[in-house]
UniProtKB/Swiss-Prot annotation:
This is Conotoxin Im9.1. The cysteine framework is IX (C-C-C-C-C-C). GO terms for molecular function: toxin activity. It comes from Conus imperialis. Disulfide bonds join 56-72, 63-83, 66-86. It comes from the Eukaryota. Keywords: Cleavage on pair of basic residues, Disulfide bond, Neurotoxin, Secreted, Signal, Toxin.
């Protein structure tokens, strides 16, 4: 390879290394940015969490309080997701 071809090659390699050290890595930029969907979900959960907790205590207990040997049942008798009664699992 001639000197004319080696000089631009070295320049491109050095330029690429400098760009990576300056934080131009798209993976890092993607991790640093927060998605607007996450912000919307977070604000919605914060806004309605009090109502969800209040309904749980009025109609039963939160399902996450059930132990591994219990299942959470809603007042209608169907499995519950958020609130209900902790009932032992029949084996």
């Amino acid at each position: 390879m001639s000197k004319v071809g080696v000089v631009p090659l070295i320049f491109l390699v050095l330029l690429s290394i400098a760009a990576l050290q300056n934080g131009d890595d798209p993976r890092r930029q993607r991790d640093e940015k927060q998605s607007p969907q996450g912000d919307i979900l977070r604000s919605t959960l914060t806004k309605y969490s009090y109502n969800i907790q209040r309904r749980c205590w009025a109609g039963g207990s939160p399902c996450h309080l059930c132990s591994s040997s219990q299942v959470c049942i809603a007042p209608t008798g169907h499995p519950a997701i958020m609130c209900g009664r902790c009932v032992p699992i029949l084996t």
